[in-house]
């Protein structure tokens, strides 16, 4: 006699089947809501997180109970028995699963904002004759005292440099040990400033730029927690008027004496940006390099309580804060597009022009990228601003239009997921042409390209060089690849012409931008700080 008819599944209890169908649904809905709000951009994201997390936990526990019920049901029936009428319940879960997959897809779709190609014929025509002026430098000759050099454009005005390495590679003047980090170095008044991480402490270090002798270091504890790529600081020190300003990977901002009389570093003021602005460090660490503008030092904490902040550079007192965007990885830059002095900031959600006096928003252009991956520094050329992002985003050239004193950003062209997709490094602009790495982050492939800024026309492309960072000097591109090579390429739109290379480091994460001052090139990886002699007349 079969016992299958006398055994009861939990689903035979009135209401239980419906309940156990609802609970897995709650699990999936909670999962979707949780991930939609996991890196919240606005209050809506926090709401999703608030409701999604408990739904997910409750639903997942219910899902385990449902699995046990399936096992109980299977054991209570013989495989040879005809399917009982109660087995109709297999259809609703199937339909429910299809519907929930569609719902999750909708949530993901709402979080993705693709761009489309655009070209404004009238603005492109005007661009052909437009002046592409660059910001004048106020730094003393022979300095590289901040991120990307005197004008934050990675262009050196030094000449008579040894940048043809096909016959003779450069001479290494010195090597010094350094700990982990991706930050570049700053050179000011014969001294070199760097940051790294030694164990659980971040450090600010000062070296003699000519000899490499360490003069002092300032160390402070810094818990990286779950920070991805936790080797060390990302932001480059800024040196100005006898003071050095730094930002660590978790948002510790310091102002130190650059040249202490007794040789002992002195902390002048400090801010813990993530705590003070009640926000979280981006998954890959705080990367904004401080910008000096007048009496202010400007950084980008990110988050709803002020994604950009300005402090009095002498006292450290907060002067203003602006925007509420999620943080990105770019650094601010100052300029005069549209004939108005402004701070241009590339956040995790868009590009903004801010009044340096009070942080008032002058204009805004949305540019949402996967992982908030807006990393490259904006490039200012006259009344135009060029931006570029990888992660399947693309690039755009914007004209900052001034009508009766009111500014707005108008796209000249937008290239969706093509032409130039800067990842870690920023292009350089020379003689109306962009030189940089177009990176496909889907397969981590990179193409070094030359692009005409005025026409968006690709002049040449080369796949032989691993992606890296680059600067311009004396008619050449000086490229440091992520696998530790230095490569020289002629900066001309005519054709790709390589002028030699030099293996500097055995590394797969050489991401720091080189710095050039007084004919010396300074490079680093996570272990070594190196100085190379690029002077033609050196012996």
Per-segment meaning from a language model:
Residues 111-177, 203-205, 213-225, 262-282, ...:
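Aromatic (tryptophan-biased) beta-strands that constitute blades/sheets of beta-rich domains
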Residues 484, 507-539:
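Blade-level signature of beta-propeller repeat domains, shared across WD40, Kelch, NHL, RCC1
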């Amino acid at each position: 006699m079969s016992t299958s008819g006398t055994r009861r599944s939990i689903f035979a209890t009135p209401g239980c089947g419906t309940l156990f169908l609802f609970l897995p649904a709650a699990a999936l809905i909670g999962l979707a809501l949780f991930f939609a709000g996991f890196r919240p951009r606005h209050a809506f994201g926090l709401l999703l997180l608030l409701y999604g997390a408990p739904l997910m936990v409750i639903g997942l526990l219910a899902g385990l109970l449902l699995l046990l019920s399936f096992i109980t049901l299977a054991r209570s029936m013989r495989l040879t028995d005809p399917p009982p009428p109660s087995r109709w319940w297999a259809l609703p879960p199937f339909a429910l699963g299809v519907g929930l997959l569609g719902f999750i897809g909708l949530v993901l779709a709402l979080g993705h904002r693709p761009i489309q190609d655009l070209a404004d014929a009238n603005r492109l025509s005007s661009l052909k004759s437009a002046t592409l002026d660059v910001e004048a430098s106020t730094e003393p000759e022979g300095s590289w005292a901040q991120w990307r050099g005197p004008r934050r454009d990675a262009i050196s005005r030094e000449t008579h440099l040894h940048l043809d390495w096909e016959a003779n590679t450069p001479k290494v003047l010195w090597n010094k040990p350094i700990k982990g980090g991706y930050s570049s170095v700053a050179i000011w008044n014969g001294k070199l400033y760097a940051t790294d991480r030694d164990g659980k402490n971040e450090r600010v270090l000062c070296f003699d730029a000519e000899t490499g002798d360490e003069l002092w270091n300032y160390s402070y504890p810094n818990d990286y927690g779950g920070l991805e790529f936790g080797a060390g600081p990302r932001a480059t020190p800024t040196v100005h008027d006898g003071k050095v300003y730094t930002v660590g990977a978790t948002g510790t901002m310091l102002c130190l004496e650059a040249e202490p009389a007794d040789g002992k570093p002195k902390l002048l003021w400090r801010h813990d940006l993530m705590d003070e602005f009640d926000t979280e460090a981006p998954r890959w660490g705080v990367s904004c390099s401080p910008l000096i503008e007048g009496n202010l030092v400007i950084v980008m904490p990110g988050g709803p309580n002020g994604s950009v902040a300005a402090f009095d550079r002498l006292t450290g007192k907060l002067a203003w804060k602006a925007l509420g965007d999620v943080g990105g990885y770019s650094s601010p830059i100052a300029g005069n597009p549209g004939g108005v002095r402004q701070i241009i900031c590339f956040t995790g959600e868009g590009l903004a022009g801010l009044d340096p006096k009070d942080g008032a928003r002058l204009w805004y252009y949305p540019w949402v990228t996967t992982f908030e991956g807006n990393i490259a520094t904006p490039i200012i050329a006259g009344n135009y601003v060029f931006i570029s992002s990888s992660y399947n985003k693309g690039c755009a050239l914007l004209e900052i239009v001034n009508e009766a004193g009111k500014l707005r950003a108008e796209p000249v062209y937008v290239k969706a997921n093509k032409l130039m997709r800067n990842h870690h490094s920023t292009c350089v602009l020379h003689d109306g042409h962009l030189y940089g790495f177009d990176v496909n982050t889907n397969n981590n492939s990179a193409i070094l390209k030359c692009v005409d800024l005025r026409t968006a026309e690709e002049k040449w492309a080369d796949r032989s060089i691993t992606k890296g960072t680059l600067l311009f000097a004396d008619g050449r591109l000086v490229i440091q690849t992520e696998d530790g090579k230095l490569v020289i390429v002629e900066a001309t739109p005519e054709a790709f012409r390589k002028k030699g290379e030099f293996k500097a480091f055995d590394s797969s994460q050489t991401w720091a931008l080189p710095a050039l001052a007084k004919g010396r090139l300074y490079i680093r990886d996570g272990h070594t700080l190196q100085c190379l002699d690029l002077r033609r007349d050196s012996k």
